């Protein structure tokens, strides 16, 4: 039954991957069942532990020409505040301006680098490669650029992150990570963004479909085996009752 449950868990993850195949910046998730050997050779020494991993390779880049679309390069992440007010990280650079003139990504407020970003009306917005946001105005035949704020860009390795159901990434609750990172991750000057482009989901549709079909067949076999075991147990009980 453990194997069947693991297959169901795999199917759930694959279904989520396929559901997000068109989600900007989505990162493919997969799961492995790892054999855990007890060196002391005690009872129940061999147990399978499931481990979740993320494919953080970049998706295909799509040119949009939109000033509020960003491609976050390398191991950089955009910082947002989720609906619970918690700091989270994303590769989705499709920014929008809400009714309060704040930048959002999928209704999550974008966090500024030591600043509160409010976008003025009737301006041309420009985001530089270092995350600085400027307004561009034409005054008396002269182009005037004014700094509005700066995006908080962070540099985090994939092993320090875990993805939530909302699609956002968070720091793992791990002692080693807490030693390496403080409660608030600092802005990194190394990270660069490119305006006018978006990173597509990196989900491999054909691979996930093949795995889904394979898992479905394995699950069917597991159910047949469980059914056969139940039948054998029932026959054995009947024989015992007859002999008694």
Curated annotation (Swiss-Prot):
Alphabetical list of Pfam families matching this protein: Flg_bb_rod (PF00460), Flg_bbr_C (PF06429), LlgE_F_G_D1 (PF22692)
PROSITE patterns xref list: FLAGELLA_BB_ROD
InterPro entries: Flag_bb_rod_N, Flagellar_basal_body_rod_CS, Flagellar_FlgE/F/G, Flg_bb/hook_C_dom, FlgE/F/G-like, LlgE_F_G-like_D1
Keyword Transferase: no
Gene Ontology biological process: bacterial-type flagellum-dependent swarming motility
Keywords per UniProt: Bacterial flagellum
Subcellular localization: Bacterial flagellum basal body
GO cellular component: bacterial-type flagellum basal body
NCBIfam families (alphabetical): FlgEFG_subfam (TIGR03506), PRK12641.1 (NF009281)
Assembly information from the UniProt record: The basal body constitutes a major portion of the flagellar organelle and consists of five rings (E,L,P,S, and M) mounted on a central rod. The rod consists of about 26 subunits of FlgG in the distal portion, and FlgB, FlgC and FlgF are thought to build up the proximal portion of the rod with about 6 subunits each.
PANTHER family: FLAGELLAR BASAL-BODY ROD PROTEIN FLGF, FLAGELLAR PROTEIN
Family classification: Belongs to the flagella basal body rod proteins family.
Protein name per Swiss-Prot or TrEMBL: Flagellar basal-body rod protein FlgF
Provenance organism: Buchnera aphidicola subsp. Acyrthosiphon pisum (strain APS) (Acyrthosiphon pisum symbiotic bacterium)
């Amino acid at each position: 039954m453990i194997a069947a449950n693991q297959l169901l868990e795999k199917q759930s993850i694959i279904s989520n991957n396929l559901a997000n195949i068109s989600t900007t910046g989505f990162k493919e998730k997969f799961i492995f069942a790892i054999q855990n050997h007890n060196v002391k050779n005690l009872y129940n020494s061999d147990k399978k532990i499931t481990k979740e991993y993320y494919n953080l390779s970049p998706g295909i880049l799509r040119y949009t020409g939109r000033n509020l679309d960003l491609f976050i390069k390398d191991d950089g992440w955009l910082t947002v505040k989720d609906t619970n007010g918690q700091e989270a990280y994303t590769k989705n650079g499709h920014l929008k301006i809400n009714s309060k003139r704040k930048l959002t990504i999928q209704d999550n407020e974008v966090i500024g680098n030591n600043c509160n970003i409010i976008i003025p009306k009737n301006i041309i917005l420009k985001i530089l490669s270092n995350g600085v946001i400027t307004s561009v105005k034409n005054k008396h035949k002269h182009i005037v650029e004014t700094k509005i704020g700066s995006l908080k860009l962070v540099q985090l390795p994939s092993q320090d992150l875990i993805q939530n159901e909302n699609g956002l990434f968070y720091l793992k609750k791990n002692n080693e990570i807490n030693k390496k990172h403080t409660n608030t991750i600092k802005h990194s000057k190394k990270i660069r963004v490119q305006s006018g482009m978006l990173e597509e989901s990196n989900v491999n549709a054909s691979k996930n479909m093949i795995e889904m079909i394979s898992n479905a067949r394995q699950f069917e076999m597991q159910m047949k085996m469980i059914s056969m075991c139940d039948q054998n147990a029932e026959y054995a009980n009947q024989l015992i009752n007859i002999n008694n």
